Amino acid sequence: MGTVAFDAIETPFGKTDKIVGGAGTFAALSASFLYDQVKLVGVIGEDFGDDNLNIITSKGVDVEGIQIIEGGKSFFWAGKYHNDMNSRDTITTELNVLENFDPIIPESYQDCEFLLLGNATPQVQMTTLNRLKNKPKLVVLDTMNFWMDIAMDDLKAVLKHVDVLTINDGEARQLSGEYSLVKAAAVILEMGPKYLIIKKGEHGALLFGEGQIFSAPALPLAEVFDPTGAGDAFAGGFIGYLAKVKTINFTNMKNAVVYGSALASFCVEKFGTERLQTLTQEEIEARLKAFVSLAKFDI
């Protein structure tokens, strides 16, 4: 479940008009490289159009769960990235059809075993989970500082029902009240999740769970064109790998973090979904080998 939207992005490398974006879009496209039964729940306006929807369906993603609101306008976000590509200014946010989004879970989705609750209001995330007749084998939740600012109690209520939380380092500190990420993880894991992933952008990601810690590197990239969908592509790759292997343990979680990191590293190479549209399995395999060699050493 996640947003399917239009973005307009400006970075030091260029700018775009309205292009396809949204957390649900990036996550679904990313997951589709690892798992062949990706199903997407979201909402779009009539303005989205078949050509844009085809970007998603061309990768085999099931869009029965996407509501198309007649006469409605799709969610739109415009932002400008600073030179460091880590900080950005939001220029425009138009919720449009997202404002009254009430997720519908089609009958064909009811056997879902692996659920990603993409970045959305905690109420929508909880509603999505409640509308599945059986609790999935694994529930992954992505959120952001905005919801911590305005809906912390609702967010904490959802956290009691999820298995994996994925947030960035600033959000981990805000949610826990601890500066040390190790201490922050201990506090957050008491809130409900069995595993926690803390994304650190160009510095990789940390995985906490089962009393263990894993640090995944980030691949140093010569050029980063657009980091907008990176976190969502990471989440999609992460859950896509776990859906493929089906067994949940710390070893598979570690591999899933690396797969997620690999997919995210492709996503940032072009604007929007452009790179994920042309990506091949051979490129993914080569990138995974690069990740392994990056952190492999003998003592």
Predicted segment positions?
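Conserved N-terminal subdomain of the carbohydrate kinase-like
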Residues: F6-K18, F33-L116, N130-K135, E285-I299
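Histidine-anchored nucleotide/phosphate-binding helix
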Residues: A23-S32, L129
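Alpha-helix C-terminal capping segments
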Residues: A28-Q37, Y241-A243
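Short beta-strand scaffold segments in enzyme catalytic cores
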Residues: L29, W77-K80, G204-F208
